[in-house]
């Protein structure tokens, strides 16, 4: 079975899709009945088309931040989806290849903080800071923000500014991405109280791993130099995936094909699965996709890795006859100087994994340094839908009732460690 997308072509093998044809309408109805409904955490379905209306505002905010601070570097202070979605989107769009525009900080230990400062040559006034947190109280993000805020103020005091002037000058380096409601977000209150540049939002009912088209990612892409037209192409392609993913026609619904592929393995007692991405553009995609998978499909662990590297750390286990697994491979269209060897490598992987179980191979359209904008939008939105469809297919095929809010969009178990951090952040200053 093949996919129909112009930016992405996938060949599936080893799954009998005819077994699922009678349930296609049921699968889609379960999804569409929840999509874009308040409290269902599926507001990301139509987010791309809503974000098309905000492109001009986002680019204007980028320009204003650079102008008011006088610097053209950005540090992203965020963790989880607030970090991995941005890293993924920058990389697949061929931006920020050398960290020339955007840095990231998401740690809480002293060595990591010192290493981050060294990337700025300890000149922290040379960067702007985007603080991304829905609540504004995320431990790791809050720790980094409070330290940097104090250092900025002290640096301006050292320049001879008064306390009030130093605080105002430091504030010119910050922009918040958080809940629009100040009653819900400490960070929004901080932004308002300190007259930070605004407004960037984390939309309601959009979980971090599903937020690749939310403000924090689009702002970062614009900051790194993505053209407006390319952003529009990317968002339009993502919305087209959303539209087709709610079609009760398996010939059109590529996301459902993928969801069935992964569900079929579990329904047949195969819990191990592997998804590999070929090439350096996917170095960060594997972290984002691993988060998407392991926070959504909680009863199994999927290995998401980059090749060729994975063939030198996991092949022994993958090809051990005692292990049963299903396999997916995402590869870029290659018409360059390495294309012959790349094609041979892909053929070798496909042939090798074909004997381990069901497989699909995904071929994505490329530009010089990454994917085309259309391909970037397509593959990113496709992953979100396929992840949720896996849960739906498994439940429907086993005659199990699905919860009102899909388990794949929630993350209740993360509170297991967060509850042990309830003492707050021990750092200079405060939020709220």
Language model region names:
Residues 1-432:
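Phosphate-moiety recognition in structured ligand-binding domains
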């Amino acid at each position: 079975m093949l996919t129909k997308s112009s930016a992405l072509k996938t060949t599936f093998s080893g799954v009998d899709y005819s077994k699922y044809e009678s349930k296609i309408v049921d699968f889609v109805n379960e999804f569409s009945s929840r999509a874009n409904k308040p409290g269902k955490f599926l507001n990301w379905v139509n987010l791309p088309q809503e974000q098309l209306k905000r492109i001009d505002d986002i680019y204007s905010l980028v320009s204003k931040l650079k102008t008011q601070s006088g610097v053209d570097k950005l540090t992203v202070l965020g963790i989880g989806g607030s970090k991995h979605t941005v890293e993924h989107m920058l990389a697949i769009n061929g931006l920020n290849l050398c960290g020339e525009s955007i840095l990231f900080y998401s740690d809480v230990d002293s060595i990591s903080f010192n290493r981050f400062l060294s990337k700025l040559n300890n000149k922290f006034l040379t960067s702007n800071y985007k603080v991304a947190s829905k609540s504004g109280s995320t431990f790791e993000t809050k720790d980094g923000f409070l330290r940097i805020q104090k250092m900025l103020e002290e640096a301006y005091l050292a320049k001879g500014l008064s306390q009030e002037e130093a605080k105002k000058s430091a504030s010119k380096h910050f922009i918040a991405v958080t809940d629009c409601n100040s009653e819900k977000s400490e960070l929004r209150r901080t932004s308002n109280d300190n007259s930070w540049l605004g407004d960037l939002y984390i939309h309601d009912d959009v979980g971090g791993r599903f937020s690749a088209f939310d403000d924090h990612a689009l702002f970062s892409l614009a900051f790194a130099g993505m053209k407006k037209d390319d952003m529009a192409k990317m968002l339009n392609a993502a919305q087209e995936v959303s539209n087709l993913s709610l079609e009760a026609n398996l010939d059109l619904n590529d996301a459902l094909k993928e969801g069935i592929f992964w569900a079929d393995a579990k329904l047949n007692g195969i819990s191990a699965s592997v998804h590999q991405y070929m090439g350096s553009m996917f170095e960060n995609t594997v972290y984002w996709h691993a988060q998407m998978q392991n926070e959504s499909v909680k009863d199994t662990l999927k290995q998401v890795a980059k090749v060729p590297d994975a063939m030198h750390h996991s092949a022994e286990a993958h090809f051990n006859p005692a292990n049963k697994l299903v396999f997916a491979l995402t590869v870029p269209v290659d018409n360059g100087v390495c294309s012959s060897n790349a094609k041979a490598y892909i053929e070798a992987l496909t042939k090798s994994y074909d004997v381990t179980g069901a497989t699909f191979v995904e071929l994505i359209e490329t530009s010089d340094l990454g994917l085309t904008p259309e391909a970037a939008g397509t593959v990113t939105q496709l992953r979100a839908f396929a992840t949720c469809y896996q849960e739906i297919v498994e439940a429907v095929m086993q005659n199990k009732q699905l919860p009102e809010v899909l388990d794949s969009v929630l993350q209740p178990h993360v509170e297991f460690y967060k509850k042990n951090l309830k003492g707050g952040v021990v750092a200079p200053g405060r939020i709220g």
